[in-house]
């Protein structure tokens, strides 16, 4: 069994699932997502490749469930080495003047409130030497991206604040930028797009892995 533990929130599809598979070669993966079937399919792929995973079919917007998960992780392993936060809600594109209130509320809950809840739960598990990873999305700007863009920017503001605060004491906070990928999230934004020129999530996960596992923090500690 791998000694290192990687917690991946948003692990059922897209980049989160691809990173779970890639990381399973060197880490025991804790895969968190709401979709049980997709998690089970991920587990099958990880087992087939010789890795190991623990599945946590949970909603990250449920703070009680997340607190229980983190207690369970501490009770079993005492710590984690890596947290990859890939969970995101991509609200439909809409003019700012007609944003649906329910879509915006869900975007806030998943992209902002859950992140703000998870950071203090997970920081003690990471300690000084762990690493947390967040994802930038430069395309989440401009017209019609109001709901997603605003909440994604708020999520990154939380990550950047934590990154600066932890610079001297740890953990290492990394904000990485994936290339455009052929994912369900992107398809919601660009339903008629020719996807042949987009990157495959597995290939992009492998590209990002070197940056994620690089022991050098994103900002040099002083």
Go through the PLM ranges and name each one:
Residues 12-13:
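Conserved glycine-rich cofactor-binding loop
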Residues 67, 88-105:
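Conserved mid-core segment of classical short-chain dehydrogenase/reductases
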Residues 88-89, 124, 129-168, 177-180:
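Catalytic loop of short-chain dehydrogenase/reductase
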Residues 26-41:
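Conserved glycine-rich Rossmann-like NAD(P)H-binding loop of the short-chain dehydrogenase/reductase
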Residues 168-178, 183, 191-222:
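C-terminal helical subdomain
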Residues 71-75, 110-130, 164:
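Amphipathic alpha-helical dimer-interface segment in Rossmann-like NAD(P)H-dependent oxidoreductases
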Residues 97-116, 133, 155:
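Catalytic Tyr-X3-Lys loop
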Residues 9, 80-88, 111, 134, ...:
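Rossmann-fold scaffold of SDR-type NAD(P)-dependent oxidoreductases
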């Amino acid at each position: 069994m791998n000694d290192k533990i990687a917690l991946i929130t948003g692990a059922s599809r897209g980049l989160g699932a691809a990173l779970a598979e890639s990381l399973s070669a060197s880490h025991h993966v804790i895969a968190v997502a709401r979709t049980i079937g997709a998690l089970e399919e991920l587990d099958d792929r990880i087992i087939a490749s010789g890795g190991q995973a623990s599945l946590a079919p949970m909603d990250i917007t449920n703070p009680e469930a997340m607190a229980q998960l983190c207690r369970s992780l501490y009770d079993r392993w005492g710590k984690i080495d890596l947290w990859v936060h890939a969970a995101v809600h991509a609200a439909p594109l809409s003019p700012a003047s007609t944003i649906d209130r329910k879509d915006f509320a869900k975007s806030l809950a998943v992209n902002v409130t859950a992140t703000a809840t998870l950071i203090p739960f997970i920081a003690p598990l990471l300690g000084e030497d762990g690493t947390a990873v967040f994802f930038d999305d430069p395309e989440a700007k401009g017209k019609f991206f109001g709901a997603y863009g605003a909440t994604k920017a708020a999520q990154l503001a939380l990550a950047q604040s934590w990154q600066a605060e932890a610079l001297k004491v740890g953990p290492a906070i990394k904000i990485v930028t994936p290339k455009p990928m052929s994912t369900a999230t992107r398809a919601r934004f660009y339903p008629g797009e020719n996807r042949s020129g987009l990157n495959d999530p597995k290939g992009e996960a492998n590209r990002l892995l070197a940056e994620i596992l690089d022991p050098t923090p994103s900002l040099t500690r002083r």
